[in-house]
Amino acid sequence: MKHPVNKSVRTLWISAAAVLAAGLASCSQQQYVAVTPMTQGMSAYEKFVAQSKKYPTVMEVYMDEALLARATSRSHIVICLSQQRGRLYVDNQVAADWPVSTGADTHPTPTGPYRVRFKEKTHASNRYGKMYNAEGKCIDRIADVCKQPGPEGGRFEGSPMPNWMRLTSDGVGMHTGKVVAGKRLSHGCIRLPHVVSTMLFDIVEYGTRVIITEDIEPGYPVAAFMAQREIEEAETKAEARPSAL
């Protein structure tokens, strides 16, 4: 699998601006920012998390090119709902970490172990999208054809879902879509930045494992670091409060 990057750069940190731009630009226009050399014994991924002060609610994407070069359809994906982050594991190491927007409270994304059932480069929803009347005027930009059939002579235009990777029998999957860091926005699907969905689409095949979990997955390599940072932040806030008289 090839990525449009300098071959000498093995670990990449894609900035939030580049992630947003990628949703509007072609793959050839995507921008990458290299992670600087590691210090104090930290791994590339640990440094990515450490430097992202507001992680996990950030738009930055992490990619380890050396690990991604070894990724196969037997690699697995974890979607952590509480963090609103996704991770690709290769050889039990985090090869990529990215923001997601999963199902809103009214349409929660189901948890559990899944496998990719089907993938399609160009796909459109058969349930959600725009509804037009017989005159061709858009009368509903967020139509749900299961709840309200279109008018006579009208037509339905399903919402585009590029790089579609289906996971469940009732239509939940992963695809390119609007992502807002830390926000659950979808009708149940897992929305991905376009640069990420393109990368994953090239890796996954029928049967690739995808684990959707509410909490951080077992073996998450920076769990201890995250817990310690939360303690330190709580202590800092406590010290900043004015003492009671």
Where are the language model's segments positioned?
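N-terminal pre-domains immediately preceding structured catalytic cores
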Residues: K2-I190, H194-L245
